[in-house]
Amino acid sequence: FPGNVTAKVLFKLTDDNAIDIKYSATTDQKTVINMTNHSYFNLSGDPSKAATDHILYINADNYTPVDSTFMTTGDIISVKETPMDFTTPKSVAQDINRTDFEQIKNGNGYDHNWVLNTKGDLSQVAAKLTSPISGITLEVYTNEPGIQVYTGNFLDGTVKGKKGITYNQRASV
């Protein structure tokens, strides 16, 4: 892509237990910039356990489906009456093994973008994840139009974290 980009990311831990992430970038030519992060969470307190028992809410009536290579098709589809519907909180496990639903079958779980209803309004929660074991809740707020949710579908125990703990399939969301 053309141009030189200077990018900055600021991580701020707040007094009210929030992580505030701010991205900025400047360029000397028109170019494409797509800044993101890949944070995954297991709120149970035990990273050796799958996070599929976590309760997930996504403030989105639509999602963007992917093809068999995990590339978005460009379509925007309603979540209504599909396993992609998290407008009512439910466990990640509830529909994650739905092999009759192509979007989940192809990705071996969730690895999709939801089109948020928040319209950039930072006062509205975009997503909420809660561990029923620990009671810890993570709320996500964003001014972006979408949110990607990945359920660790291809973690296979070869990645080691703190204290040598291995991350198995679906160890985080």
Residue ranges: model-predicted function:
Residues F1-V173:
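An exposed, glycine/acidic-rich loop-and-rim segment of catalytic or binding clefts
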